Design a protein with these regions (language model features):
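Asp-based, Mg2+/Mn2+-dependent phosphohydrolase catalytic module
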Residues: 2-15, 123, 135, 139-140, ...
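Active-site neighborhood of HAD-like aspartate-dependent phosphohydrolases
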Residues: 6-56
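Hydrophobic side chains within well-formed alpha-helices
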Residues: 32, 47, 101, 152-155
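Alpha-helical elements of Rossmann-like donor-binding domains used by nucleotide-donor carbohydrate transfer enzymes
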Residues: 34-35, 50, 84-88, 104, ...
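Hydrophobic alpha-helical core bundles mediating ligand binding, dimerization, or RNAP-core interactions
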Residues: 36, 51-55, 82, 105-109, ...
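Short helix-capping segments at alpha-helix termini
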Residues: 40-44, 92-97, 151-155, 183-184
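A metal-dependent, Asp-based hydrolase signature
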Residues: 45, 53, 58-103
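Short, acidic loop-to-helix structural element flanking the phosphoryl-transfer center
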Residues: 75, 79-80, 95-133, 144, ...
Length: 243
């Protein structure tokens, strides 16, 4: 019998804080497709998908690579690689991206739509005495605008950017920021992400990981699975429900 792709597992215990990935988990990275479709009819969805894929590819490439004889680390702020990903995607799709259109799309990315269940879930977690926060590849300025636009500021104890270590997820130093900010060991922190690669790496790091499988797709086939899986952010409530 085939196991359901969003089958949950046992509830998590001993959790004192819940950290969320931002882009794709709290904020809908594909909501930019509506504007993209208006600007480039028939190409909006393709552009938004390729843009996101390239953004993530660039983050991994920079973190994994070293430059020159001294093997110097490479880093560019997430805003810059987001712009680079947009430019690449438009070239790949043979779309004429003027400076004006670029700024319109980048501004839309700055104000991505939040998923509707965000406030309910964050408030419920705080009502249970759990600390909440974001652990994201986004740079501080991006996260500040996104959080304020969504009205989530008062529901978050921590907004953590990997910019402080200049390394992107899935580097362990990026995930270590969660322990540093909360003062808790990874085993007492639930990490919530809709990105399977992120959930996998966070599990390897030691977090109790909740995967939000919004697209009902298989998890990565590398021998490790998240502690809990659901189809919306409410999976965090289900995973951490009182016994």
């Amino acid at each position: 019998m085939t196991r359901p792709l969003c089958a949950p597992k046992a509830q998590l215990t001993g959790i004192k804080a819940v950290l969320f990935d931002a882009y794709g988990t709290l904020f809908d990275v594909y909501s930019v497709a509506l504007l993209a479709e208006q600007l480039f009819p028939g190409q909006g969805q393709s552009l938004s998908i390729l843009w996101r894929d390239k953004q993530i590819e660039y983050s991994r490439l920079l973190t994994a690579s070293r430059k020159g004889p001294q093997r110097e680390p490479l880093y560019q702020p997430f805003w810059e690689i987001t712009r680079a990903g947009l430019r690449y995607a438009c070239k790949r799709l043979q779309l004429n991206l003027s400076s004006e259109l670029e700024e319109r799309l980048m501004n839309q990315y700055r104000h991505l739509s939040a998923f509707p269940e965000n406030r309910e879930v964050l408030q419920a977690l705080r009502d249970r005495g759990l600390r909440t926060g974001i652990l994201s590849n986004g740079d501080p300025a991006m996260l500040d605008v996104a959080v304020k636009s969504a009205g989530l500021g008062e529901l978050l104890d921590h907004v953590i950017s990997v910019d402080s270590v200049r390394k992107y997820k899935t580097d362990p130093e990026a995930y270590a920021l969660g322990e540093r900010a909360t003062g808790l060991p990874a085993s007492q922190i639930a990490f919530v992400s809709s990105n399977a690669w992120d959930a996998l790496a966070a599990t390897w790091y030691g977090y109790a990981t909740i995967w939000v499988n919004r697209q009902n797709i298989p998890f990565e086939e590398l021998g490790t699975e998240p502690a809990y899986t659901g189809s919306t952010l409410r999976a965090a409530l289900d995973a951490l429900s009182p016994a």
